[in-house]
């Protein structure tokens, strides 16, 4: 199994010689071997896509958001670092971004992993901060009685 390693490439170069736009890094502890879910969107409204990672299968529902502008200079500035569900769950958490409220910031939508039901939770970008868990804008069970998790996107 893979670890929580992130690499980002210039999409125009993928058909020939892939060009990295940021240096590789581990979103979570290197000892984890369950991979991660990733998405990108401008949650802080600075015009750069930020990188959002969610714990992979077998991991906790941890969400990490890193400032995209800083990543381009290989610096890691946390925009958020919180658990988006039951901290005891080990199904990971799926992540997506979408503008839910029409402002200039992307908003975060997360889906529970396998074994944690089928919860979908949304957080407004304006409520996401580097410390603490943001207040949920919405939270619902997408498939009542289903325990296999839910992909969002």
Q: What are these model-predicted stretches?
A:
Residues 8, 51-53, 65, 85, ...:
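Functionally constrained cores in energy, signaling, and assembly domains
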